[in-house]
Amino acid sequence: MSEDAQAPQEYGADSIKVLKGLEAVRKRPGMYIGDTDDGSGLHHMVYEVVDNGIDEALAGHADHVTVKIHADSSVSVSDNGRGIPVDIHPEEGVSAAEVIMTQLHAGGKFDSNSYKVSGGLHGVGVSVVNALSDWLELRVWRNGKEHVARFEGGETAEHLKVVQECGDRTGTEVRFLASTDTFSNLEYSFETLEKRLRELAFLNSGVRIILIDERPAERLETELFYEGGVKEFVKYLDRSKTPAMPEPIYIKGERDDIGVEIAMWWNDSYHETVLPFTNNIPQRDGGTHVAGFRGALTRTINNYAQSSGIAKKEKVSFTGDDAREGLTCVLSVKVPDPKFSSQTKDKLVSSEVRPAVESLMNEKLAEWFEENPNEAKGIVGKIIEAALAREAARKARELTRRKTAMDVNYLAGKLKDCSEKDPSKTEVFLVEGDSAGGSAQTGRDRLTQAVLPLRGKILNVERARFDRMLSSQEIGNLVMALGTGIGRDEFNIEKLRYHKIVIMTDADVDGAHIRTLLLTFFYRQMPELIEGGYLYIAQPPLYKVSRGKSEVYLKDQAALDDYLIHQGVEGAVLKLGSGEEIVGQDLTRVVDEARQLKRVLDAFPTHYPRHILEQAAVAGAFVPGAVDADLQGVADKVAARLDLIALEYERGWQGRVTQDHGIRLARILRGVEEVRTLDGPMLRSGEARKTGSFTQSLQEIYNTPATLVRRDRSQDIHGPLDLLRAILEEGEKGLSLQRYKGLGEMNPDQLWETTLDPDARTLLQVRVDDMVEADDLFTKLMGDVVEPRREFIQQNALSVENLDF
């Protein structure tokens, strides 16, 4: 064999890759920033830069951080801190700002004199953001001068230079455009950013964080500023619950260089919410700070109950679980050198934090109990109630165990089990009512599919105590069918009899209500099933379409539109003004583009008429740059296109430029002036940019009127929405459409084909991405307090589709 052929298999020193500078980050971005496909990594880029501003605030040098999402999907973060150092770095020979931007593990976080504690991650922070951006612009206001540097692809494109004087202003601004080579999309979620920035504003009281989004047609802005810090955070978390005390207990102090801040109170619910943070970073899985807090809480309350004589009088002993029933707490620690169980920082393992939290909590909580005897008695009374309910539940459970032999026979009459005993291969369908249960039992695969019909509405567990819940027949059946047991001491996920639990309810209001009640039950009583990915929601079809003898089942509106477009395009020809004809697959592509554009236009506020937006899109009013180059010319084009689609006696549109560089369109109709305005900020928004990306292909097709011909019928087409409407109408001709409301309307064969057959069905897996939001939503929708529920309905009423009376 020749040497050349052998060479690739040699493993020598030159096979070892040393990834210099930021190359390592671009090679393995997930290690540094998280998932680059699901959006979490993209948002993490913003948090990395924000953390620098927050660290300045923690060090006492800043009180303002502004985050702005620009229309081009770039993001800028500015603060009024000291400004990144701009002097020349002694070792590197370039400005310190450039070293921070272009080298991993460079920064002030490793020098404990600059920052005592910091939230910024492994010293990779802003250099990682630079590495994963197409471009990044840095502005520094320091020493009376404004300095600017630009980086492209992680490398310095323009060295730091002074551009002007800036007086007393100090601070830093970083603006970056994330790279599409790394991230599959650049869609920032305003809600996701707002949630994290709100956490930071609560945890750092006195810091004002402003979030601005310039992408929508009407820009969004929110200011997050909380003087009360974690006390305000606790009130915010419990905004939909009834507190058991007027003000939260607030504890703040320092032990062995570890700063501890705790705010807590009890409410009228039966669930515990503890949110732990270390240096502003949340820990989903708790850690030593939570262990210290829980130990001290139980011990202090026990001591108070003994010393005040309440425990003796009530003759009941309570556990930590009883003490934490209905407790909401935010626990924030500031640790100089924290240790976590993994890179994601979901669990704190620094052993020195536990005694620090425990001793401070013991001392301060005992003081609070002594100083507030009335409230202390109320809290202990609530905990004793929880202990008595736990005792009652234990007795109810023992009773249930004794009845098991009878119950198994009773359950056998309800649960139609499957013959397979391996849980990983089996699934159980929770079906609404006996009629649907009958169809499901007949249509299922008896080897792997079990069916449990639920009669009526199950108990709302949000408002029920544990002992009352156990006495509910339907919940008893459900727990017995799953086999896991229920309650903190009894629940065992290893005993789960089915690895797919599928909620299958009707597509009407009652079905939605029963599904919500079941989700509330699983979220509150068996959250491990959701975390393990065992809970699903079936998607029975919403429509049946018949033509002659053929029948098709369609799961939702989008599937129906697909079907109608397929039917409408068949035999249709779109004749363009240029003489070109579009048919078949090409016509389907044009109609699909019209659907995409409709989705983009639907995101604009409703006071912009859709037909005006449609014609403005064809005229090029949304193309970035073109608008600024010749806005009057664009206004004239839009007016001309509106005249084109108007009846002869309704024409006369005039376009002119407004003061905010928008377009004013007006016509006189029956002696009255009709005015429509496309605002300047809207024409430059992110939504406008998305619309502008369609303009070139729209002009190729609709610049001059087109004609749609199908089966000897023809109609003029003036725009994409016009075409979509015409094709859908053509597709509907000769069809019979049935909308299903109940599963009982289907016979067993239909149910198998559409909903039960693993090869053909669609299942939605239930996941919880944000525990705080989920907790608040269940409390709002299912809790006792009416006002937050009414507000929720008013805010979301207009978004409802398929309202069923």
Name each model-derived stretch.
Residues 1-805:
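Conserved phosphate-chemistry cores used by DNA topoisomerases
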